[in-house]
Regions:
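An alpha-helical, amphipathic repeat domain used for nucleic-acid recognition
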Residues: 2-190
Length: 190
C-alpha cells in the first residue's frame, strides 16, 4: 500500500515485550521500534503516511529516547558525574552526538551536576567512610570532576574535621596492634 513520492503508510502499531516500546510496520513490513514518547511526539497512528526524512528523524529521536532511558536508569541508583554517564552510554554503544544531547538534557533538568556530586561525595566520605582529602581528591578526579569543583567541595572539609578523622583512624589501627610492643606499634602507626 505505497503512496506517491516514496511515502510509506503505517499499517500496524504493536506493543513490544519491553514496556513503553512499540513496533511500527510500514506497508505491512516491520520498519522499526519506537519509544512511547516518540510515538506520542510524532502522533504516529495507523494510516499516517511518512516520508524518508521523517522516518530518519523518528529513528534519531528514538535513539535519544533509548540513551536517555539508559542514563536515567544508571542515575536511579546513585549520583553520577558527566564522565560516568558518558562512559555508561559508550558501553551501550550510544553515538557521541546523542550522548551530548542526553547530557545536555540531563544537565538542564538538574539530574547531572558535577559540583553537586563532589559536594555530596565529600560529605559522605567525611561521615560514613572516613577518608582524607587526598584520597577524596583522587576519587573525584577519577570520576571526572573538574579540579575547580574538587577544590570547592574540599573547602568544606575543615582542618579540625581532618584531625578528628585522622585520630579516629589512628585509634582504630592502634586497637589492631595492641599485642605488639609499644615501639613496634609506634612504627606501624607512623
Amino acid at each position: 500500500m505505497r503512496t506517491i513520492d516514496g511515502m510509506k503508510t503505517i499499517t500496524k502499531i504493536a506493543t513490544q515485550k519491553r514496556a513503553g516500546r512499540y513496533s511500527i510496520e510500514l506497508d505491512n513490513q516491520f520498519a522499526f521500534g519506537v519509544a512511547e514518547s516518540v510515538l506520542i511526539k510524532y502522533g504516529l497512528a495507523k494510516g499516517r503516511t511518512l516520508d524518508e526524512d521523517l522516518i530518519t528523524q523518528i529513528k534519531y529521536d528514538d535513539a535519544i529516547a533509548k540513551a536517555l532511558t539508559i542514563a536515567l536508569n544508571y542515575l536511579g541508583h546513585a549520583l553520577r558525574t558527566t564522565k560516568q554517564i558518558k562512559q555508561k552510554m559508550r558501553d551501550k554503544a550510544v553515538d557521541e552526538d546523542i550522548q551530548a544531547q542526553v547530557i545536555a538534557q540531563l544537565t538542564q533538568l538538574g539530574y547531572v551536576d558535577d559540583q553537586n556530586y563532589a559536594n555530596h561525595y565529600v560529605a559522605t566520605k567525611k561521615l560514613i567512610t572516613p577518608k582524607g582529602p587526598h584520597v577524596i581528591r583522587l576519587a573525584l578526579q577519577q570520576a571526572g570532576v573538574a579540579e575547580n569543583m574538587i577544590e570547592q567541595a574540599l573547602a568544606t572539609y575543615t582542618f579540625d574535621e581532618q584531625c578528628r578523622i585522622a585520630t579516629k583512624i589512628a585509634e582504630k589501627l592502634a586497637q589492631g596492634y595492641q599485642r605488639e610492643s609499644t615501639r613496634l606499634r609506634q612504627q606501624k602507626m607512623v
